[in-house]
Amino acid sequence: MAYLYVVEDDKNISEIESFALKNAGHTVVECASGKEFHKLMRDRIPDMILLDVMLPDEDGLEILRKIRQTPETRRVPVIMVTAKTTELDKVKGLDLGADDYITKPFNPLEVIANINAILRRTNLNNQTKEIVI
């Protein structure tokens, strides 16, 4: 399955996400700050990132912007996970390049389904590129 980063400062939310993802067969690495996330990204680029918008040391939307501006990471799927529920917040995240935007509280089964759908599309795109080349 996939190698995922869960970037979430709320330990309870992080544990729920990680538990559900691990039970679905994914490998999960958790971190609680932008600083930790950037360190992880230097070590390994994941298959997908679940990213909280409101982190203690850095805005998740700014992290998303950096991910999309970096050639090595611009195609990594990112799901924003946040308590911000206004349409404007969702539109901003999606406009910056988020692949999905999930609001808290969330249903873990729905999150897993969204992740699997995005990973299927990502894998299909990768297979298509291999065939074309």
Where are these regions (language model features)?
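The feature encodes the CheY-like receiver
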Residues: 14, 56, 74, 86, ...
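C-terminal output helix
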Residues: 106-119
